[in-house]
């Protein structure tokens, strides 16, 4: 199927995705699950097969970059067997003639320009495109067949997601200066959605720290899980991170993800407030809005899966 819509509608739909990830904070999928799933349900249905393109462009855009990464992190550390399907396309409708062009128009309409985009290396850029395109296809589960072996698919897809997170961690540590090449270095006078090199560097550093904290915590909390698929996932995560996280690095059993999240939030506020005072003395850059007009809550099926729209029958 292929249906094309007017640019005005297309821009609004793409802008909804940008806003969603601009507002997305760590653990939204856990702590604000109902409203997050409702909003995401609408966005994915509107974008259809352009979902991976929207994710790609939101990852590249500085104000929504952290939201995309934390959304992917929330999926990677979820114990719900169907959450990975949120990276899959919703339906097979292609609503836009040129999704990339629609994204650029959406950015222009909301005051974003070329200085609002990251510039990862060609190798990482190719990997990112390949990863998102692959997950858009492979994270869709056949309702007639896949539902019966959802646990096995869960382990395979989560391993793929964690491999991407690991690659992000290593590449952002090695090549972050080049990623920030197009960003402004001015101390003030930046557009509302722009971020200086210093501020974006601080955000990426915090994401990298969160990746390590949550990976250690997930391994620690689930290595003795009663569910064999969760134990298998822990084994694969440990293999992926073997050169970074050793057995001695695993946190104590008494630690909780909520504690880690609170510590991370405190660090985020302290570090970014310091940077923001220097780079953005007047704009409300770090004020996260909450959408109050989300659609009604999804069916309880979303408690274990990510909604019927993720499946193809």
From Swiss-Prot:
GO terms for cellular component: host cell cytoplasm; viral outer capsid. The keyword Signal does not apply. The keyword Transcription does not apply. It holds the Pfam family Phyto_Pns9_10. It comes from the Viruses. Its main location: virion. Keywords: Capsid protein, Host cytoplasm, Outer capsid protein, Virion. InterPro entries: Phyto_Pns9_10. It is found in: Virion; Host cytoplasm. Minor outer capsid protein. Belongs to the phytoreovirus minor outer capsid protein P9 family. This is Minor outer capsid protein P9. It comes from Wound tumor virus (WTV).
